[in-house]
């Protein structure tokens, strides 16, 4: 496919700290990856000689750091599990797309402290993780949490004309996801030293007993779709916005992941140590239950808080794609108008969630992978 026929996925998470404040589900998903990170760090130490390692820094690389709010605990886990010699320098590297809010990331990193006394150096790497981002053989442990379901690029949907069916679009996305993961692992094989470790988690696709897809975070997704339909019917948005609005992500089934990991080029470079899936529930549900128990007479207030929390969580990821669709579908360039339309969509989505999904659990399946570099 020629570059002219594809659209790079260059929309970042919502900036200015909004994503940082609305990534609680990603935090819960990250906690499931900590045992894998500890195992990857321990295995890396067991397979390498400290005398040889001291010729270079001990390097940890995170792919898809966003604003860094879920970076500290994984890196701390690696450092506690690996414990480099006190004289060895440590290099922490944080990668995301060039459009990421690196200012917020840098600010968040300055507040972090680490459980070792080693000299620590930090780098920010603005580049697609579907390319090389670090020198060959320079990384000991790498990880990517809640990012790899975002595709590198997709064929854009035209504002006017025939719209591909869901089945056709999913088949295209599935093929792209397979190619993307192969590309990602190929680049990581260049960067990670033999004996090093790689831990991944990303949104997965659970299937029902008859093979049907179980929608992740079904309530907020349905609410935002209904809100957009309301805006279309009210004439606030043009049909072209609905045509081009799309989040270029693919939720892999566990079978999709195993198929990619079984490819010859992957087998040649990596030991597959662990692959599993797990359901993650947005932690706001637990807080909602605590609020209702503490103040049983304020049900409406609690429901509104919960709707705002889970909708804002979804918007932290998809708001940029909505703005992009309004720009492309309606030709709107005035930032005040864009902000106003986004605010209306968010408010309508909260209302729709309260109407049809009040206090529902927000659930998402994640796939977890631990690989060892041969």
UniProtKB/Swiss-Prot annotation:
Presence of the UniProt keyword Protein biosynthesis in the record: no
EC number: 2.1.1.-
Biological process annotations from GO: methylation
Keyword Isomerase: no
Induction of the gene: Expression is positively regulated by the acurin A cluster-specific transcription regulator acrR.
GO MF terms, alphabetically ordered: metal ion binding; methyltransferase activity
Entry binding sites for S-adenosyl-L-homocysteine: 19, 70, 96, 128-129
InterPro entries to which the protein is assigned, alphabetical: MeTrfase_7, MeTrfase_capping, SAM-dependent_MTases_sf
Protein family according to the UniProt entry: Belongs to the methyltransferase superfamily. Type-7 methyltransferase family.
PANTHER family: S-ADENOSYL-L-METHIONINE:CARBOXYL METHYLTRANSFERASE FAMILY PROTEIN
Protein's job: O-methyltransferase; part of the cluster that mediates the biosynthesis of acurin A, a highly reduced polyketide coupled to a serine via a peptide bond. The activities of the highly reducing polyketide synthase acrA and the nonribosomal peptide synthetase acrB are collectively responsible for the synthesis of the acurin A core structure with a heptaketide backbone produced by acrA covalently fused to a L-serine by acrB. After the formation of the PK-NRP hybrid product, it is detached from acrB by reductive release to set up the formation of the lactam ring by aldol condensation.
Protein name: O-methyltransferase acrG
Organism: Aspergillus aculeatus (strain ATCC 16872 / CBS 172.66 / WB 5094)
Lineage: Eukaryota, Fungi, Dikarya, Ascomycota, Pezizomycotina
